[in-house]
């Protein structure tokens, strides 16, 4: 039979509150609303379906403080200790939210999905408290270092107050992707019962799986006469990870490689914190709630990589040690992850610590795999499966098929528009991909017709962010994007780059058209500079608004010195050096 839930009872609030659904939905219409962030949405889903049992809501100050300091919920019903729970699950709000929504002890507020405005639950406020973010970072993540993605999120995104309180469920968040693979804990437990699975080894992953992972999980199952639950995270993972759509297709391609009836794939809508040892204990609690009896804990489990000093945030086996420390209370058996390596001589995988000294081995690192995908180089069958590689190649085409964005920045009349048009023609002549031209003045009127020539600095920043969004989407689709706004501020250019690199695939190049103001004014046949100096136009860059010259442009050019064909040729050479054309 499946493992008992953490705390003894599965807190399936969706089932518990089903009889109240209509009345709760009607009440929600009259309440103030909190629209959840993506992390809060993931957290709420696992609160509602029992994945976070024994939680029944967002932590109050007593539970929060206890979790941060002791990895346990606050003691209850006369017990000396509370249940093990290593990660604080909190709902953050601002002072403005508190004032606007009338948040206070006993108040009720609707929690809504920002994607469709659906009311998911009603929270009854038990308390409002100000967390010590430095302490939370030090205790939970191990360091107050913004190189850690969760510390950066805590410092930059989390608001100044937390609201604690139990929730009543109205409905779970709606998903339209991979619906047959999404199970609540109760549903997955019922599935195990139907299949008569008594022992289940759960495998946590946020990366694509290859032959080594398959061999590891099969080995773990056979040693324990158990079945395998492949339970990948499809909520929030580490920034830069492979998107979950690609990963799930890769998992589906992998599943037929398992012996018939051995393994099952289910998706977990978890927002990871990358908290290493604490995260491993948390993952064990969650898998216990989903019915698993065993849980694989890897080397540097859920580690975020390097800190600001270039060292790992956690030791390689800290996670395994912390799970072992709580093993009696967790009541889920840890399976230590031993890295697997390929032995060409015997055509098999073995744990690295079992390979005789001097035996030839072969491995492909994540960096090498990405390089092979980028260049189109072969990926050997001993490393992965044909179906998995096919999925990855479709999502990560080689460089000549990838999109890219070139941002030309400079003063009005610096020549950037002329260069952009000439570059567009050159790339279209090559015919390898679609080419999109985003000129600043044209895009400004298209994206916001109410904005005229005399726009404020903040409007300029917002306008470039909008152009960045368009550029990122086009780049992601494989287009060549040439953007030529003035882009006068460094922070705006960095925001633009972040959008393209984060969403568009990372192929971004900055060209500074450094033609000086005197020359730009001299050739200004439209009289914009003259009008600005006469006070007829406000905030014209270079006259009464600053232009911050970029310091690290990929190319700097000046139309007084360089011809347009020479500049275009230089840009093409940059693209060729990156194997993009």
UniProtKB/Swiss-Prot annotation:
Catalytic activity: sulfate + ATP + H(+) = adenosine 5'-phosphosulfate + diphosphate
EC top class, as a word: transferase
Site (Induces change in substrate recognition on ATP binding): 337
Gene Ontology cellular component list: cytoplasm
One Pfam family matching this protein: ATP-sulfurylase
Gene Ontology annotations of biological process type: cysteine biosynthetic process; hydrogen sulfide biosynthetic process; methionine biosynthetic process; sulfate assimilation via adenylyl sulfate reduction; sulfate assimilation, phosphoadenylyl sulfate reduction by phosphoadenylyl-sulfate reductase (thioredoxin)
Binding annotation for 3'-phosphoadenylyl sulfate: 441-444, 486-487, 526
Keyword Amino-acid biosynthesis carried by entry: yes
Residues that coordinate or bind ATP: 204-207, 298-301, 340
Translocase is among the record's keywords: no
Regulation: Allosterically inhibited by 3'-phosphoadenosine 5'-phosphosulfate (PAPS).
UniProt site positions, description: Transition state stabilizer: 210, 213
Biological or metabolic pathway of the protein: Sulfur metabolism; hydrogen sulfide biosynthesis; sulfite from sulfate: step 1/3
Active site location: 205-207
NCBIfam families assigned to the protein according to its UniProt record, in alphabetical order: PRK05537.1, sopT
Biological role stated in the UniProt entry: Catalyzes the first intracellular reaction of sulfate assimilation, forming adenosine-5'-phosphosulfate (APS) from inorganic sulfate and ATP. Plays an important role in sulfate activation as a component of the biosynthesis pathway of sulfur-containing amino acids.
The name this protein goes by in its record: Sulfate adenylyltransferase
């Amino acid at each position: 039979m499946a493992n008992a839930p953490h705390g003894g009872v599965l807190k399936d609030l969706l089932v518990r509150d089903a009889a109240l659904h209509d009345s709760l939905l009607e009440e929600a219409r009259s309440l103030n609303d909190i629209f959840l962030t993506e992390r809060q949405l993931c957290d709420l889903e696992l609160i509602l379906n029992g994945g976070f049992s024994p939680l029944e809501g967002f932590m109050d100050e007593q539970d929060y403080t206890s979790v941060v300091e002791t990895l346990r919920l606050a003691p209850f019903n006369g017990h000396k200790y509370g249940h093990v729970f290593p990660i604080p699950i909190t709902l953050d709000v601002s002072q403005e939210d508190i004032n606007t929504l009338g948040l206070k002890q006993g108040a009720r507020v609707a929690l809504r999905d920002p994607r469709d405005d659906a009311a998911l639950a009603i929270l009854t406020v038990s308390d409002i408290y100000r967390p010590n973010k430095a302490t939370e970072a030090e205790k939970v993540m191990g360091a107050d270092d913004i190189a850690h993605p969760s510390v950066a999120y805590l410092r930059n995104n989390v608001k100044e107050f937390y609201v604690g309180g139990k929730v009543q469920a109205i409905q779970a968040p709606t998903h339209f992707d991979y619906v047959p693979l999404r199970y609540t804990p109760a549903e997955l437990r019922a599935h195990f019962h139907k299949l008569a699975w008594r022992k289940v080894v759960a495998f946590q992953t946020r990366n694509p799986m290859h032959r080594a992972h398959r061999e590891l999980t099969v080995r773990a199952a056979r040693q324990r006469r158990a079945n395998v639950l492949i339970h990948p995270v499809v909520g929030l993972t580490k920034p830069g990870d492979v998107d979950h759509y690609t990963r799930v297709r890769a998992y589906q391609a992998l599943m037929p490689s398992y012996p018939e009836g051995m393994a099952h794939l289910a998706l977990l809508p978890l927002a990871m914190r990358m908290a290493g040892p604490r995260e491993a204990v948390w993952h064990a609690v969650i898998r216990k709630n989903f019915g698993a009896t065993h849980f694989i804990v890897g080397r540097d489990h859920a580690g975020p990589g390097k800190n600001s000093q270039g060292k790992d945030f956690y030791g390689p086996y800290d996670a395994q040690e912390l799970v072992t420390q709580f093993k009696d209370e967790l009541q889920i058996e840890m399976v230590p992850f031993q890295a697997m390596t390929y032995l060409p001589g015997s055509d098999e995988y073995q744990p690295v610590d079992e390979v005789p000294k001097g035996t030839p081995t072969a491995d492909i690192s994540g960096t090498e795999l990405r390089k092979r995908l980028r260049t189109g180089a072969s990926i050997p069958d001993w490393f992965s499966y044909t179906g998995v590689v096919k999925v990855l190649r479709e999502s990560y085409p080689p460089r000549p098929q990838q999109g890219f964005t070139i941002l030309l920045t400079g003063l009005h009349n610096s020549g950037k528009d002329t260069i952009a048009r000439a570059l567009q023609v050159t790339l279209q002549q090559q015919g390898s991909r679609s080419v999109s031209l985003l000129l600043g003045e044209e895009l400004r009127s298209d994206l916001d017709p109410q904005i005229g020539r005399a726009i404020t600095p903040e409007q300029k920043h917002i306008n470039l962010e909008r152009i960045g969004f368009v550029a990122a989407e086009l780049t992601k689709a494989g287009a060549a994007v040439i953007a030529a706004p003035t882009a006068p501020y460094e922070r705006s250019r960095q925001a633009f780059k972040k959008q393209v690199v984060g969403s568009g695939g990372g192929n971004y190049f900055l060209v500074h058209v450094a033609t000086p103001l005197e020359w730009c004014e001299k050739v200004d046949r439209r009289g914009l500079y003259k009008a600005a100096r006469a006070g007829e136009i406000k905030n014209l860059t270079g006259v009464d608004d600053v232009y911050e010259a970029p310091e690290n442009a990929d190319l700097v050019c000046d139309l007084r010195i360089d011809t347009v064909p020479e500049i275009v040729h230089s840009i093409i050479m940059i693209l060729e050096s990156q194997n993009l054309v």
